């Protein structure tokens, strides 16, 4: 398959790398010049610096011959517009829309007319909600195995002795094939993290990681502070 991805953020990058590892052809459209240059070092496919809500940019990504288009930025409005434009240019393309607002997601699932433009609607909260459910119904549960993807979703307990406690996500230096999908503080409050999110001194961190990255992720997340 040939897949065009909008957004070279944490999610877009991880999806692109996973698709390429399965033998698919990938193109990424990214507005930020530095980010576009950086991501070109990690994927073998086409990287286009530009706005995916611009018809010419989508055409440069060969959208008319693509099998799927995934709008994965953190901006709902831009994702929506890009999916509509992709469908207009290629009526047979499968569109995947990322929505950060869970309330909007249900609208896209329930309104029949919207399904013309959006084949699949996903949100980071879906993954977190599924994890919460599994935790509640399965005593002692702290990981989800994803054999088809060659990956796991795993929970790490955080306390004041952990090296990562109090640090922003962007400073953890996690491997490329991993992604923090949820952070809980000691009161159980959920945060879908960005790079600036601070790891709590007490709580849990939920991470998606490919098997090749698991050991490095565990090493980072389980490291304790050196005694003074």
UniProtKB/Swiss-Prot annotation:
Organism of origin = Pyrococcus horikoshii (strain ATCC 700860 / DSM 12428 / JCM 9974 / NBRC 100139 / OT-3)
Give a yes or no for keyword Iron in this entry.
no
Where along this sequence does the record place binding of NAD(+)?
A: 7-11, 30, 51, 73-74, 98
Name of a matching Pfam family:
TrkA_C
Q: Does the keyword NAD apply?
A: yes
Q: Where is the RCK N-terminal domain?
A: 1-122
Which Gene Ontology MF annotations are present?
A: potassium ion transmembrane transporter activity
Q: Which PANTHER family match?
A: POTASSIUM CHANNEL PROTEIN 2-RELATED-RELATED, TRK SYSTEM POTASSIUM UPTAKE PROTEIN TRKA
Q: Under which name does UniProt file this protein?
A: Trk system potassium uptake protein TrkA homolog
InterPro entries found in the cross-reference section: K_uptake_TrkA, NAD(P)-bd_dom_sf, RCK_C, RCK_C_sf, RCK_N, Trk_Ktr_HKT_K-transport
Q: Which GO terms describe its cellular component?
A: plasma membrane
Print the domain comment field. Answer: The RCK N-terminal domain binds NAD and possibly other effectors. This is expected to cause a conformation change that regulates potassium transport.
| UniProt KW keywords | Ion transport, NAD, Potassium, Potassium transport, Transport
Chain ranges of the RCK C-terminal domain? 141-223
> What does this protein's UniProt record list under function?
Part of a potassium transport system.
């Amino acid at each position: 398959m040939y897949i065009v991805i909008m957004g070279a953020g944490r999610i877009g990058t991880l999806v692109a790398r996973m698709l390429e590892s399965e033998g698919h052809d990938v193109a990424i459209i990214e507005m930020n010049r530095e980010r576009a240059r950086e991501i070109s070092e990690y994927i073998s496919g086409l990287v286009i610096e530009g706005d995916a809500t611009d018809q010419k940019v989508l055409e440069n990504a060969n959208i008319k011959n693509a099998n799927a288009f995934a709008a994965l930025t953190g901006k709902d409005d831009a994702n929506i517009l890009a999916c509509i434009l992709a469908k207009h240019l290629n009526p047979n393309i499968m569109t995947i829309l990322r929505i950060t607002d869970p309330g909007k997601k249900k609208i896209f699932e329930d309104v029949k007319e919207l399904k013309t433009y959006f084949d699949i609607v996903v949100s980071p909260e879906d993954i977190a909600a599924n994890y919460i459910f599994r935790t509640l119904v399965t005593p002692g549960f702290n990981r989800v195995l994803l054999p088809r993807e060659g990956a796991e979703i795993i929970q790490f307990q955080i306390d004041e002795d952990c090296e990562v406690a109090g640090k922003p996500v962007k400073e953890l230096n996690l491997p490329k094939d991993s992604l923090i999908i949820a952070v809980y503080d000691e009161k159980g409050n959920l945060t879908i993290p960005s790079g600036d999110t601070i790891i709590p001194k007490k709580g849990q961190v939920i991470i998606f990681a490919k098997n090749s990255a698991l050991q490095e992720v565990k090493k980072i997340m389980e490291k304790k502070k050196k005694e003074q």
